[in-house]
Amino acid sequence: LALSEGYFSRRTWGDWLFALLVVAGAVFAFQRYHGAMDVYDKGILVAAVPTAIWLAWLWRPLRTLMLVVAALSLLAIVSYDGDLRRGDTVFWLKYFLSSQSAILWMSVLFFMSTIFYWIGMFARGPAAALEGLGSKLAWVAVTLALVGTMVRWYEGYQIGADIGHIPVSNLYEVFVLFSWITALFYLYYEAQYKTRAMGAFVMLVVSAAVGFLLWYTLVRDAQEIQPLIPALKSWWMKLHVPANFIGYGSF
């Protein structure tokens, strides 16, 4: 009990405000979409609330990340206004916030991050600060990867209720997942150990994944949202795939 009291007493007003926003967001999502949720979806939503709060309290940069991703995703959803054709006419959707645009920017920024990490690793003097720029670019890339994932989820349901699904069902979607999870784990360890020595090597792995993602997109038109095959229409997939790639990314 004393440990719990000490833990909660260390929370700032910003921590509690973030927790309130997460709870409010979950309540809104439940009220608006509960008709489309089965019991497993509702269970995952309930479990996601304390998990998101705990992670943001554990590592405060995640709080900023979650808020920015939520704000940009909501901006995209409001801008679509239920009509996917607006993705070709609304400037910020067409060039930044539609799922394909956000993921393309993610790809470019991960490549740039890798380049700056490598330059910074071998540079001396002021040029060594380029590793810091690589770190910042990686953060922006992670943000856009998450925005692209959230918006793709929305776009799927706008195409059709039987087509929409959590975007972790094919190689295109899971390589996006792998890229941002790997980068985010690295950024956590970078902050914890206060060194960017491994940045060039980790981001090289991420860039390789992004390279495959782009090749697969060009060869297979993998960016197109397709309905789930029957074998993947399971609540277990919603847990199994992210858990797998959390393991891959942390490894």
Give a label for each model feature.
Residues 2-89, 98-225, 232, 239-251:
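Hydrophobic cores of alpha-helical transmembrane segments in multi-pass integral membrane proteins
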